[in-house]
Regions:
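Pre-Walker A adenine-sensing motif
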Residues: 181-197
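Flexible phosphate/Mg2+-sensing switch loops adjacent to catalytic phosphate-binding sites
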Residues: 226-240
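Switch/coupling sub-region of P-loop NTPases
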Residues: 238-305
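Charged, amphipathic alpha-helical linker segments immediately N-terminal to NTP-binding catalytic cores
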Residues: 130-184
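Short, ordered loop/turn segments at secondary-structure junctions
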Residues: 86, 156, 210-211, 248-250, ...
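N-terminal accessory targeting/assembly segments
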Residues: 1-147, 158
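Helical mechanochemical/support elements of P-loop NTPase systems and associated helical scaffolds
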Residues: 21, 25, 97, 101, ...
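Glycine-rich phosphate-binding P-loop
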Residues: 193-225
């Protein structure tokens, strides 16, 4: 593993003012640097992992990662990456490694991780990321201030390509809110965002098979995270304390109070301080709900047929 410190990378202070904006900047820079590495890797002549330089590959969510961090106080940037040392048998090819570390990497870092050296297109991309993040946080604040559970914007693309991919499905039907649940939320950048509000309380999603019930619930489940542009779920946002709960046959449970759901067990076990190494479907789901409530969650998501 190789770590690189870039003192005073020079990114505008507004990108670092809030935690959400700083994380979005770090995420965008990591993606930008990853693309530059991918282009360079195509010209690599070595086989296997020899001579490769790799960084963490972000998914669709915008998350804080140790792969790239920026200090909000000093603006110093730290990049952590993995370098596959070029080798010949059991020997490291030091001359090739020197080329990678001292000739190839420095210009890539200078051109992609120092603000003054970015192209106009790269700077515009970072500004778009900043504006999207500000809009997302404004909607999250609206959800909190108005006792909502979640918000789903009109035009959102909820279906994914497959169960093994988190990419948006092409030609999917875009989400449209029912009129009686539609609201418009003012955001710092652009026109108000229209979509469906989900108030706090018990909300039941019903419909026929293949009508998107689980797809909507899955999108709400991921709504605790911000998503990148063109994901389709940029403005599908839920309370930050939302938790998905379900039955987990066979899970271990230790000293959970599930007496609100189950009081009398045939083996005379206490449900006030329930313990087992092999929970059934009902006791595991009861334990999951109890643990979610103990953690402070005010929004439970359950997919039950």
């Amino acid at each position: 593993d190789v770590s690189v410190e870039v003192p005073h990378a020079g990114f505008p202070q507004k990108y670092l003012e809030t935690k959400a904006c700083r994380i979005a900047l770090q995420d965008a820079l990591l993606r930008m640097f990853g693309k530059a590495l991918a282009k360079k890797d195509k010209t690599r002549k070595a086989s296997g992992k020899s001579g490769t330089v790799r960084v963490s590959r972000p998914g669709q969510e915008v998350l804080e990662r140790t792969a790239l961090t920026i200090s909000p106080k000093t603006g110093d940037l730290r990049l952590n990456m993995n370098v596959g040392f070029p080798a010949n048998g059991r020997k490291i090819c030091s001359d090739v490694l020197e080329q990678i570390l001292f000739n190839q990497l420095p210009p890539m870092i200078e051109n992609n991780l120092i603000y003054a050296n970015l192209t106009d297109a790269q700077k515009e991309e970072l500004e778009n990321v900043y504006q999207l993040t500000c809009n997302q946080q404004a909607i999250r604040q609206y959800i909190q201030d108005n006792d909502l559970a979640a918000f789903v914007a009109n035009g959102s693309v909820l279906p994914r390509v497959s169960g093994a991919s988190d990419l948006p499905m092409e030609d999917a039907v875009e989400f449209k809110s029912p009129e009686d649940l539609e609201i418009a939320i003012d955001v710092p950048f652009g026109a108000p965002v229209k979509g469906m509000k989900i108030p706090l309380g018990v909300t039941l999603i019903v419909g026929g098979g293949y009508h998107g019930k689980s797809t909507l619930l899955k999108a709400l489940e991921r709504g605790v995270y911000n998503h990148i542009a063109k994901d389709g779920r940029e403005y599908v946002l839920a309370r930050k304390d939302a938790m998905k709960v379900r039955a987990e046959d066979g899970r271990a449970v230790h000293n959970d109070d599930i007496s609100m759901f189950i009081q009398n067990l045939p083996n005379i076990k206490s449900t006030v301080s329930f313990t087992t190494e092999d929970a059934s479907g009902s006791t595991s789901q009861a334990a999951n709900v109890a643990e979610a409530l103990e953690s402070g969650s005010q929004l439970l998501l359950m997919d039950e047929d």
